[in-house]
């Protein structure tokens, strides 16, 4: 599941942030990029549905990716306006925590077969995770 792949990435980031010793010479940046890509894949999957075998061309996949990034960027710009770019004062570890919280929400929604009580939709959670990962990378100087 894409949600589990995102969780693995976020959990590894959390471990890298907490542990001084690294046994694999890969940093947080690549994991944040992975979170962004898996979240976009999840948004595409929500739009098109789940399939057993790839059924879109590379060109169509790229168009869908760009479309979801553009929609997510617009959401980020609107939220930045409303929240006064509060993310700029946040630590990378706090952004990681927010990603993990969103993942818990997504898992709960998935476990309830898409039903939510008061929560936003699953797609909004993926969009927020993309934006938190981008904010973290900006903080890292990427």
Predicted regions and their residues:
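Intrinsically disordered, low-complexity regulatory regions
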Residues: 1-142
């Amino acid at each position: 599941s894409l949600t589990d792949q995102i969780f693995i990435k976020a959990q590894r980031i959390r471990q890298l942030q907490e542990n001084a010793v690294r046994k694999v010479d890969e940093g947080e940046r690549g994991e944040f990029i992975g979170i962004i890509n898996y979240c976009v894949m999840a948004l595409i999957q929500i739009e098109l549905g789940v399939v057993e075998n790839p059924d879109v061309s590379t060109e169509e996949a790229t168009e869908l990716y760009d479309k979801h990034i553009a929609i997510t960027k617009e959401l980020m710009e609107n939220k930045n306006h409303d929240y006064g770019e509060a993310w700029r004062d946040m630590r990378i570890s706090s952004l990681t925590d927010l990603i993990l919280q969103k993942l818990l929400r997504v898992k709960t929604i998935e476990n309830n077969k898409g039903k939510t009580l008061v929560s936003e939709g699953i797609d909004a959670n993926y969009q927020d995770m993309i934006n938190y990962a981008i904010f973290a990378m900006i903080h890292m100087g990427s």
